[in-house]
């Protein structure tokens, strides 16, 4: 089977095992070189004993051993240590550190960077040696006499390697043998093991037992073994003296090949009892000397050389010829390689046929020897006519003749004919056919024939009759193994599993089978009774119970209850035991192998033999989410116990629960996330800070023309967006209230602005004259009409306007009122409930000039001094809304105060405005002509992209808008009529 043939040959990260093996007498720890403060990810037992700290206490502490600093620790040495870590260098220091019990100890500290396959420093290896005896004064009272001598002797004995390291290199003194780890650290980082996955390496001049060359060589040895098994019995039986030079050379070459095979066996790896590949030359030689060396050596002695000489005594020649049978021991090579050849069905069939033929050949040689011994009676020198050889000689026409001169019998069948006839008889007997042309006649021949028939029937029935049964019974596990492998291969091929994952699956199956030998542990345990099953489980988990102090106070019943709940898991390199985010539902004990804990793509811990990871279920009430990935670096054996099973046992054995909770220390708690900062991130932050510090900031002043231009574009965009959303007729009417002060008194007035809006405006806006009495300076209404459409919308704005005393008269006062309105335009809480006095009126001039404009059915507002409106169609009935509050954009549930406005105050204000307006218009008439063309061009450009805002205070000033521009919205300012209205009309 491949598992037994190849062994465990998957790439493994054996860094931890190599360091532990090389530093068996040293104390060391490993720190992550990619995380700030270089936290400790592993510490061996030697360091824990030397420092007094438990491994769980040291984990995640700084590799600089800052937790062991004290008052007497040299500050300069501390700085040098940090510089060594910062620069990823190798260095050594003498530093004074403090144990856990605060005992000061001098250490010889060595630091070496560990690189991965990309030549990136990922770990730091720090080794420690206690040199306190060399640093303390020797001539004090406590060190005199025999005490001083004993201390020096112990120091020189236990710290020989440290003394050599402390000795200057330029002194020509006798240098003792260094420790292996010290040699590694002194020779440089090239010899240090790398933290990476790699295939098992073989030393020089060592051949892998599963390589192509060794496989071919084994098949050659198999063929030569069968050659030896055939020729040795033939030469012994037929007493052939090797006079033929060709056969002698061939046999000599075969002997040389077997001698070479012995030499190769001293340099060939083998599979250990645990499935591992043994490549140590010393172990290989010892294993071969204890097993097959003696047998192989006896089978390779050159026995044919004795027979090659002419003058050799017949007895000696016969003896050495008989010793050739020892070469049949070479068949042991076939036996020990049989599991290699049984891997293929065709090879099994060929081997079985060859075995049958080989047995027939041996029996044929024996059959001829019996006939040759009985055919001539050496005592009487007569021939036995009842021998099968004599009968054969007569049947084939080559009878025996007696040579009287020599006194011997000559003639008879040739040796070839004799061998073929002997083989023919044995084959017919073994296959139970028996034609009878060659039959035994003497008693010895008959007895041999009976034995041969028994052997033949057994061979025939075994090999040819029960081949399927033999395979099923003898190779049941092998067949099941191959069946499982075939099923897995078909599954991987069917679902197109990636190649890398497929190799991991196959390697896991092979390694698991190699460890369990195909035995179903659960099935075997289910056969055993409860008591026996518990005893077996305690034996299987004995390593966990003996190594961890948490189980020392457990009773036999408690251990048996725990052992039954434990499960054994075998992990291949690269397998993930826990994924980040998974529920941690088991407590894991590492029995063999090494694992790494990866958080945020960084190694935060390396777990080895004796470590425990998982969660403290006995202290937490909820399941934890794994904060990191736990991945196997090598082939690992884990003993795990589920959360529910553990809590069940702890609840029953309360006394053990307290001891277990107190003594069990998790090497890695997957519930707690480790907070760290990567060195690369710190460097990036520093570079970003320096970049921002050196970056030149550009700022544009507030009054810069470019900033003003962009602000203007932004305001125009907002106006367009607001104009496009005015679709609710109830929101298009706002009533504005204003208060004015005249001669120190508060005068209240109401200005009604009516906005009629139809479809979206397509042309530029302009003001047009709407009143018949425009020549008189009593302007009743000024309208901004749109370009068609009958769907008009009215907008009323109510806003309080405070008229301050001393702000002017007439037009000046109106301008002041408008300025006050702009200052108070955000105060929407002063909206009144006064009825509107402004009514829409028809404009015959505008209807004549613009055919597309629909005539307004509303008449001009009729008013009198008493403020009574005579119009039969009021503005509050023109739209759908019936209440002025419904025209306001403020929420309906808000309460608004009302301020009644007398019509007399409004009339007085408008009269003053009329006179003031008359004077101002005369002054502006000359300027309007020049500005008319410019304004028209500006409005023409902006008309396609902008929509005027009806509620804007600027839109209420009629002096800045040129007349006779069609398709405009209507702004009408209603006031009471006066007798002088016709005189107050002014042409724009």
Swiss-Prot record:
Binding-site residues, a nucleoside 3',5'-cyclic phosphate: 550-667
Domain notes: Contains a voltage sensor domain (VSD) formed from the S1-S4 transmembrane helices, a pore domain formed from the S5-pore loop-S6 domain and the C-terminal cyclic nucleotide binding homology domain (CNBHD). The segment S4 is probably the voltage-sensor and is characterized by a series of positively charged amino acids at every third position.
Cross-link (Glycyl lysine isopeptide (Lys-Gly) (interchain with G-Cter in ubiquitin)): 785
Superkingdom of origin organism: Eukaryota
Protein name: Voltage-gated delayed rectifier potassium channel KCNH5
Ranges of the Extracellular topological domain: 239-243, 313-319, 368-419, 441-446
Biological role stated in the UniProt entry: Pore-forming (alpha) subunit of a voltage-gated delayed rectifier potassium channel that mediates outward-rectifying potassium currents which, on depolarization, reaches a steady-state level and do not inactivate. The kinetic is characterized by a slow activation time course and a small voltage dependence of the activation time constants, therefore, starts to open at more negative voltages. The activation kinetics depend on the prepulse potential and external divalent cation concentration. The time course of activation is biphasic with a fast and a slowly activating current component.
UniProt KW keywords: Calmodulin-binding, Disease variant, Epilepsy, Glycoprotein, Intellectual disability, Ion channel, Ion transport, Isopeptide bond, Membrane, Phosphoprotein, Potassium, Potassium channel, Potassium transport, Transmembrane, Transmembrane helix, Transport, Ubl conjugation, Voltage-gated channel
GO BP: potassium ion transmembrane transport; potassium ion transport; regulation of G2/M transition of mitotic cell cycle; regulation of membrane potential
Intramembrane feature spans: 420-440
Residue numbers on the Cytoplasmic membrane side: 1-217, 265-291, 341-346, 468-988
Region (Disordered): 717-742, 838-890, 969-988
Highest classification ranks of the organism: Eukaryota, Metazoa, Chordata, Craniata, Vertebrata
PANTHER family (UniProt xref): POTASSIUM VOLTAGE-GATED CHANNEL SUBFAMILY H MEMBER 5 (PTHR10217:SF533), VOLTAGE AND LIGAND GATED POTASSIUM CHANNEL (PTHR10217)
Region: Calmodulin-binding, residue numbers: 704-715
Reaction(s) catalysed by this chain's protein: K(+)(in) = K(+)(out)
Biased composition range(s): Basic and acidic residues: 871-885, 977-988
Organism in which the protein naturally occurs: Homo sapiens (Human)
Residues found modified as Phosphoserine: 883
Family membership noted in the UniProt record: Belongs to the potassium channel family. H (Eag) (TC 1.A.1.20) subfamily. Kv10.2/KCNH5 sub-subfamily.
Residue positions of motif Selectivity filter: 432-437
Disease (UniProt): Developmental and epileptic encephalopathy 112: A form of epileptic encephalopathy, a heterogeneous group of early-onset epilepsies characterized by refractory seizures, neurodevelopmental impairment, and poor prognosis. Development is normal prior to seizure onset, after which cognitive and motor delays become apparent. DEE112 is an autosomal dominant form characterized by onset in infancy, and a wide range of seizure types including focal and generalized seizures. Cognitive outcomes range from normal intellect to profound intellectual development impairment.
Residue stretches making up the PAS domain: 12-90
Gene it is expressed from: KCNH5
Membrane-traversing stretches: 218-238, 244-264, 292-312, 320-340, 347-367, 447-467
